Amino acid sequence: MAAQGRLITDTSNFFDIGPGDTLLVAGRRYLIKGEEREYRFGIEDPKFWVKKAVDGRTGERKIIKLRYDESFITDLGRIKIRCFRNSWKESDILKLVGNHVSFMHGVTYLDDHGNPVRVLDIVRGTNFLNYIGGFRMPHEKYFRTELPGILRKLIDAFQAIAFLHTHGFRHGDIRNDHVIVENGGGHYVWIDFDYEFDLPENPFSLDVFGLGNLLTYAIGKGFHDYYMIRNETYIYHDLADRLELEDFSLLHRSRLTNLRKMYPYIPPMLNNILMHFSRGAHVFYESVDEIIEDLNGYLSSL
């Protein structure tokens, strides 16, 4: 266990930095209160490189992200893609976006050993995963009364990703828990853009497919995987018998993309947007702007 009450100037060993320690960086002191945790699939995982802290000068609560180098391989269809963390990229994006309402805000300092220390403002709100899960109503009512407004907000968020792409950056890890629905104004705010990936042939494709996942989640009021469809027949009835491989996601191969087979009131125009991300797709979106154009076309038809 880390000793308490130490003054930390080297963040290389982030596991050894714990509650009660004070981080000294660029002449500023931050009292460490603990680690952030990630909640996914019912599992709570501590993120030891992401610290909860209090600014010793202002008393404000902050999130501090320390340098953490990791990599893994993911699949896009039959293509294997190396993904990795890049603290410097996130630092560059923080500079680029400034006070842009669609991104988290923060500043990067260097510790005594040259490690980047990102000091982030807390985005107060609910992540998109929980926000959509909070609609306690039948899907058809949700689809007709709530979804149009959600899609308009998503378009704003998608435009923010297009802004990154225009400047040569990728978000790198687009997920429904990396969008925060902000308290008050309701802006959709992107967080956690330190992931990067190697795919020079189509440099923005993982971001584009990540946006497809957000759309699938929003339109379906949750994800619908084959295991659920096959086993929860009291909800899905005979849907499993009517599905083909082409109805599922190219990126997440057991996730239903052809939602019109489940909810026949979804118009073909909207469902066709989703089908660009399916295993049966013959045409894929090459840019965020193409998705935005089709979403605007659908909303204009309502």
Identify the meaning behind each predicted range.
Residues 279-302:
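Terminal C-lobe "cap" of eukaryotic-type protein kinase domains
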Residues 105-146:
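Conserved structural core of kinase catalytic domains
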Residues 188-270:
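C-lobe/activation-segment region of protein kinase-like
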Residues 92-111:
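Conserved HxN/HPN-centered segment at the entrance to the catalytic loop
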Residues 1-41:
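Juxta-kinase regulatory segment immediately upstream of eukaryotic protein kinase catalytic domains
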Residues 153-154:
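Activation segment signature within eukaryotic-like protein kinase domains
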Residues 161-176, 181:
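Catalytic-loop of the protein kinase fold
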Residues 37-95:
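ATP-binding glycine-rich loop module of kinase domains
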